[in-house]
UniProtKB/Swiss-Prot annotation:
<keyword id="KW-0699">rRNA-binding</keyword>
<keyword id="KW-0687">Ribonucleoprotein</keyword>
<dbReference type="GO" id="GO:0022625">
    <property type="term" value="C:cytosolic large ribosomal subunit"/>
</dbReference>
<keyword id="KW-0689">Ribosomal protein</keyword>
<dbReference type="InterPro" id="IPR004389">
    <property type="entry name" value="Ribosomal_uL18_bac-type"/>
</dbReference>
<dbReference type="GO" id="GO:0008097">
    <property type="term" value="F:5S rRNA binding"/>
</dbReference>
<dbReference type="Pfam" id="PF00861">
    <property type="entry name" value="Ribosomal_L18p"/>
</dbReference>
<comment type="function">
    <text>This is one of the proteins that bind and probably mediate the attachment of the 5S RNA into the large ribosomal subunit, where it forms part of the central protuberance.</text>
</comment>
<comment type="similarity">
    <text>Belongs to the universal ribosomal protein uL18 family.</text>
</comment>
<dbReference type="GO" id="GO:0003735">
    <property type="term" value="F:structural constituent of ribosome"/>
</dbReference>
<dbReference type="InterPro" id="IPR005484">
    <property type="entry name" value="Ribosomal_uL18_bac/euk"/>
</dbReference>
<comment type="subunit">
    <text>Part of the 50S ribosomal subunit; part of the 5S rRNA/L5/L18/L25 subcomplex. Contacts the 5S and 23S rRNAs.</text>
</comment>
<dbReference type="GO" id="GO:0006412">
    <property type="term" value="P:translation"/>
</dbReference>
<protein>
    <recommendedName>
        <fullName>Large ribosomal subunit protein uL18</fullName>
    </recommendedName>
</protein>
<keyword id="KW-0694">RNA-binding</keyword>
Length: 122
């Protein structure tokens, strides 16, 4: 049986491997996703400056009022829409997607698809 610490360590190793290749610039910042057991977080980061330009999560007060649960696909879809709306309002239309070492399915995929539908290109 794989312990929880082993899974977390393997995910961190995958994320470091991905981060060697995925780099956000001012023209195409990085859309970074983190998934915990209860929440999902998305940030758009300019790696050249080291600044977070836009962020959204299931902890946002306006999003909490609209969703019943914070750990399902519907919540991830709402976070994807919200981060895309915030990015487009700041003039960001193209990003590089960083899945954070997680598999591209389930909540991660729903967030990415919702962000694409809302107007982000990646």
């Amino acid at each position: 049986m794989i312990k929880k610490e082993d899974r977390k360590f393997k995910r961190i190793k995958r994320h470091l491997r991905i981060r060697k290749k995925v780099f956000g610039t001012s023209e195409r910042p990085r859309l970074s996703v983190f998934r915990s057991e209860k929440h999902i977080y998305a940030q758009i980061i300019d790696d050249t400056k080291g600044h977070t330009l836009v962020s959204a999560s299931t902890l946002d007060p306006d999003l909490r009022a609209r969703i019943a649960k914070t750990y399902n696909k519907e919540a991830a879809k709402e976070v994807g829409k919200l981060v895309a709306q915030k990015a487009l309002s700041k003039g960001i239309s193209q990003v590089v997607f960083d899945r954070g070492g997680f598999k591209f399915h389930g909540r991660i995929r729903e967030l990415a698809d919702a962000a694409r539908e809302a107007g982000l290109k990646f």
